Amino acid sequence: MHKHYHQAKFLLSCPSLKGCPPDEGYEVIFAGRSNAGKSSVINTLTLQNKLAKVSRTPGKTQHFVFFELDKDRRLVDLPGYGYAKVPKRVKTKWHKDINEYFNKRDCLRGTVLVMDIRHPFKLFDQMVLNWCHSINLSTQIILTKSDKLKKGAASNTYLKVHNQIKKYPYVDVQLFSSLKKQGLEILGARLNTFFGYVD
């Protein structure tokens, strides 16, 4: 695991693209449905339990949250989408902002698409994957909470998702458990590729 992930620090939070840092360097986004475990993945990756705020309330992340690895590289936690208990107008704004981010952010180098292994590939997951595919953006699908399923069931879900993504040339999938630190090295290696890090 590259040391820069452990040195990650909060940079800024903004409600729309207008408040984002300058469009330069490298950014990798973490996208996922509400309560899929995005914040837990970021905290596990960085070895910082409180870097990304973990909430039991779906849709708590309502801003673009930027974490700086070094002066040229950033992790971005996108607003949680899906069944978040927020007004429809807010959901509509999230959709517009996220779509704009994918299509206008030149420094975007990759996506980590976080899915709860018990509920993979919902409509919004497919939407994000289609956005990534439309701009040829490399994507790592993380099937989180794999410890919630027995090994056989987790493997079956992995294979099912793996078959679903065969038509996408820049997409890979892996199992992940923040609790057991499963899949951390695989994720780190993929992020190194996105960011141009060399071990």
Curated annotation (Swiss-Prot):
Give GO terms: molecular function aspect only.
GTP binding; metal ion binding
BP-aspect Gene Ontology terms: division septum assembly
Q: Which Pfam families match?
A: MMR_HSR1 (PF01926)
Tell me which GO cellular component terms the UniProt record holds: cytosol
Q: Where does Mg(2+) bind?
A: 39, 61
List of residues binding GTP: 32-39, 59-63, 77-80, 144-147, 176-178
Tell whether Glycoprotein is among the UniProt keywords: no
Q: Which cofactor does it need?
A: Mg(2+)
Q: Which InterPro entries match?
A: G_ENGB_dom (IPR030393), GTP-bd (IPR006073), GTP-bd_ribosome_bio_YsxC (IPR019987), P-loop_NTPase (IPR027417)
Q: Which UniProt keywords apply?
A: Cell cycle, Cell division, GTP-binding, Magnesium, Metal-binding, Nucleotide-binding, Septation
Q: Which SUPFAM superfamilies match?
A: P-loop containing nucleoside triphosphate hydrolases
The residue ranges of the EngB-type G domain are: 24-197
Question: Function of this protein?
Answer: Necessary for normal cell division and for the maintenance of normal septation.
Q: Which family does it belong to?
A: Belongs to the TRAFAC class TrmE-Era-EngA-EngB-Septin-like GTPase superfamily. EngB GTPase family.
Q: Quote the protein name from its UniProt record.
A: Probable GTP-binding protein EngB
Species source reads Ruthia magnifica subsp. Calyptogena magnifica
